[in-house]
Swiss-Prot record:
This is Ribonuclease P protein component. Belongs to the RnpA family. RNaseP catalyzes the removal of the 5'-leader sequence from pre-tRNA to produce the mature 5'-terminus. It can also cleave other RNA substrates such as 4.5S RNA. The protein component plays an auxiliary but essential role in vivo by binding to the 5'-leader sequence and broadening the substrate specificity of the ribozyme. The lineage of its organism: Bacteria, Pseudomonadati, Spirochaetota, Spirochaetia, Spirochaetales. It holds the Pfam family Ribonuclease_P.
Amino acid sequence: MRKRNISLKSKIEIQKIFKEGKLIRFSNLNLKMFYKSNHLVYSRILVTFSKGFRGSVKRNRIRRLFKEAFRKRLELLEGIALDIIFVVSYSKLTLTYFSIESLMKGLVLRCERGIGESK
């Protein structure tokens, strides 16, 4: 069985999410989340960083943590197909896996309510 790709890669789709998607801000974490429903049967994620975010090791670690937390929380998104973009904007951020996982759980539930209201 082929592994499903949960990454969002198309430049056109990314621009569309930034323009038409809904925004959730977390000022205490310097984090923004854009989301929009998609035409697929599964959800996808993109983790991006502002220009001032220094250190590739830290960027890649945070990206891996977000993707793993998202992968583990996919069962919560059963039946809902979303494209989600996280924008992290501060490099002195101390994000642990558990904080990202709890954040992801709350965001998924918040997205479900947002998508449910727009239908």
